[in-house]
A protein has these predicted regions:
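Extended beta-strand-rich segments in extracellular/periplasmic secretory proteins, especially
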Residues: 140-191
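Short, Lys/Arg-rich N-terminal segment immediately upstream of the first membrane anchor
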Residues: 1-4
Length: 217
């Protein structure tokens, strides 16, 4: 009986060690692979000045989503491009973080290169940029390779992956109304489990600020 237990214990330890080595030394968990994977895909969107041009990449339609913290609230905008030639529509929503209650909801429409809002005043307060980050910056694998890498992650279990950088990017800082010299954490995430395009760009800082932009089919 004791011999059987020793064999079982050895098998368990061996299995755990195998999984650890698989995760630690997965060939996909390296900077070059992840930057090629992420950079190649996000360059399809960053930059795109006219939202209607996204139909060139996603002829079956797309969704663009953005969220950022504003005081004690979170502001989200989600637009859906359902059909080429038709207006791209959605909502701009302010939500109290504690209660989860929507305090302001603004209808948004993008057509012929222009945003229109059901409440222009509220829109200018909640979304002063009145543009998405992908309309302002260029991202690709060559650019990512020049940044200071903070961390990387790849999961063999579900195929999710992430890259985190410490950066000072004047264009991004200007878009977020940050000081030009501010250092931010810039992250990119995706997953092999998503058959269609689904990538997020996240900006955070040491003071707890959070910004996320996601484009997906």
């Amino acid at each position: 009986m004791m011999k059987v237990r020793k064999i079982l214990f050895a098998c368990i330890i061996g299995g755990v060690l195998f999984i650890f080595l698989l995760l630690k030394y997965n060939p996909r968990n390296n900077r070059a692979y992840l930057e090629n994977r992420i950079g190649t895909e996000v360059s399809r969107v960053y930059p795109t000045q006219n939202l209607e041009d996204l139909f060139e990449q996603f002829p079956n339609g797309f969704i663009v989503y953005q969220a950022h913290l504003m005081n004690e609230n979170i502001v989200k905008i989600k637009l859906t491009g359902a059909e080429k030639g038709a207006p791209i529509k959605g909502e701009l929503i302010e939500t109290e973080r504690k209660s989860g209650e929507n305090t302001r909801v603004v209808s948004v429409e993008y057509y012929n290169g222009k945003y229109t809002f059901s409440d222009e005043k509220a829109a200018s307060e909640l979304w002063p940029q009145q543009s998405f980050l992908f309309q302002k910056i260029t991202l690709n694998k060559d650019f990512l390779s020049t940044l200071k890498l903070k961390d990387k992650y790849y999961s063999s279990m579900n195929g999710s992956f992430e890259l985190n950088y410490d950066v000072n990017l004047p264009e991004t800082n200007e878009y977020l109304s940050f000081p030009a010299s501010k250092t931010i954490e810039l992250s990119f995430g995706g997953s092999n489990s998503n058959r269609n395009y689904y990538y997020s760009v996240v900006v955070e800082d040491k003071d707890g600020y959070y910004f996320r932009e996601t484009v997906y089919e």
